[in-house]
Amino acid sequence: MYQSHEFYLRRAIEISKEAREAGNTPFGALLVNKEGEIIMEQGNIEITEKICTGHAEATLAARASHEYSREFLWDCTLYTTAEPCAMCAGAVSYTHLRAHETELH
């Protein structure tokens, strides 16, 4: 069942807090399928994993593209705690995610 954008964004904020508590920069992302189910979550991992591209959005995009087809991802929505940087925006674009939300309204 689909929840409000606020629900998903608040969960993304919680993921960012978890990333910070783990020693990373506080960013989070999650992927929601067309039925409204959260199917993937990711916090930043660039510090603890020593991966310079370990931003939440890019890492989630890479994981999602390995696990799901482009057609499936087209109907998914990415929620993030901030507007993606250029690297992450490119990764999201190549993953063929239909949309992303970054703001509470």
Spans of model-derived segments:
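Local cysteine-cluster metal-coordination motifs and their immediate loop/turn environment
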Residues: 81-94
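Conserved small/polar residues in nucleotide/adenosyl-binding loops
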Residues: 95-104
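Short beta->alpha transition motifs characteristic of CBS
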Residues: 39-46
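A short, polar/charged loop-to-alpha-helix boundary motif
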Residues: 48-58
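Short beta-strand scaffold segments in enzyme catalytic cores
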Residues: 27-32
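Immediate flanking context of iron-sulfur cluster ligation sites
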Residues: 72-82
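Short, basic/aromatic recognition patches
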Residues: 2-21
